Amino acid sequence: MKVIKVTGAIIQKENKFLICRRGPNEKAAGLWEFPGGKLEINETLEDCILRELKEELDIDAELHSLYDNYRFKSKDVIYDLYFFKIKEYSGNMLNTVHD
């Protein structure tokens, strides 16, 4: 069975957490998620989440730690999910993917 590694970012500021809703043209449109995405070939988990945050939110982030990981099995695919706490970020957060 195919295994896909996915990263997600836990961004907390003043007791609020950032979650994003998937855009209307995306798979699972309208569902809520932490920002992040799939690991590319020859990419580390840390590099993946930093790249995804730059692509999706136009921010440069500093990782705090790996918070948790979870394995989700669908009919045809296994997803290994890795959630990172974000220590700090810079840039004006722009939503480039979600609605």
Tell me what each language-model feature is.
Residues F17, N25, F72-S74:
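Surface-exposed, flexible loop/turn segments at secondary-structure boundaries
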Residues M1-L18, K38:
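Conserved N-terminal beta-strand and adjoining loop/helix that marks the start
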Residues W32-G37:
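Conserved acetyl-CoA binding element of GNAT-fold acetyltransferases
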Residues L39-L63, R71-D99:
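Unchanged
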Residues E26-G30:
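A conserved beta-turn-beta hairpin within the catalytic core of GNAT-like acetyltransferases
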